[in-house]
Amino acid sequence: MDIKSFEKIQLYGFNNLTKTLSFNIYDICYAKAPEQSKAYIAYIDEQYNAERLTKILSNVADITGANILSISKQDYDPQGASVTMLVAEEMTVPTLTPESLTGESPGPLPGNKPSPGSIVTHLDKSHVTVHTYPETHPLDGISTFRADIDVSTCGHISPIKALNYLIHSFESDIVTIDYRVRGFTRDINGQKYFIDHDINSIQNYIAKDILNLYHAIDVNVYQENIFHTKMTLKDFKLNNYLFGVSEEELSDHESASIKDQLRDEMQEIFYGRNVTKV
């Protein structure tokens, strides 16, 4: 479905649209022994601690042209971390969102921040949050790490331009992405706009070199301004999923069994349902 292109239209008051990006990544691992599972959880917990997550979210704010107002961060015991940022937009004249902030193309990596004008308003409904969830299966050696990132903005800022950077920031076997636009804004003649930028697919905001690594499917509800994409890695190399052991140290039977376990785990996560064992 093609959505009409938006010309720059002068708005009445501020842009009141709320745009929300939900980004969920999964890293899957197999550890042969319980102590190796514990070591993986400790490793991944340290890799994505609150300090590093704060840097990632700061770059998200930078890419979207937002101004950070406050930061709250916390590491949890025994594992996990969370960071919440309150951000404000940096724009001058209230118009429909500039192409550079929402154009249907991959967003920049850190260092290419859109040029802001003077700050005219603090929008307290704009925020960025991340939570991490390391966990391990009690019996079969499978461990997973999940990170949930939510970027909700009110005004010109669109979080979708940060998507390309977020995918680069995490080692992701599976990625689930949701984007939605809510509310409406008016032009100076009183006409409502329920979305202020072109979008046909979330995939158009992801660089081709990244997309080529994944199988990706879309489920979009255009009339409701709801867009959904999920991706799973194409290339399966067992050594990339082993922690504390290499494939060369395993018997052929062990390798085959672990591959089956990992593929089942990834399939269940990707489709969001348990696989029936035959």
Swiss-Prot record:
Keyword terms: Autocatalytic cleavage, Decarboxylase, Lyase, Polyamine biosynthesis, Pyruvate, S-adenosyl-L-methionine, Schiff base, Spermidine biosynthesis, Zymogen
Native source organism of the sequence: Alkaliphilus metalliredigens (strain QYMF)
Gene Ontology terms: biological process: spermidine biosynthetic process
PTM comment text: Is synthesized initially as an inactive proenzyme. Formation of the active enzyme involves a self-maturation process in which the active site pyruvoyl group is generated from an internal serine residue via an autocatalytic post-translational modification. Two non-identical subunits are generated from the proenzyme in this reaction, and the pyruvate is formed at the N-terminus of the alpha chain, which is derived from the carboxyl end of the proenzyme.
Classification via PANTHER family: S-ADENOSYLMETHIONINE DECARBOXYLASE PROENZYME (PTHR33866:SF1)
Domain of life: Bacteria
Active-site residues from the entry: S126, H131, C154
Modification sites for Pyruvic acid (Ser): S126
CC cofactor note: Binds 1 pyruvoyl group covalently per subunit.
Quaternary context: Heterooctamer of four alpha and four beta chains arranged as a tetramer of alpha/beta heterodimers.
Record pathway: Amine and polyamine biosynthesis; S-adenosylmethioninamine biosynthesis; S-adenosylmethioninamine from S-adenosyl-L-methionine: step 1/1
Protein name, UniProt field: S-adenosylmethionine decarboxylase proenzyme
Cofactors: pyruvate
GO CC terms in record: cytosol
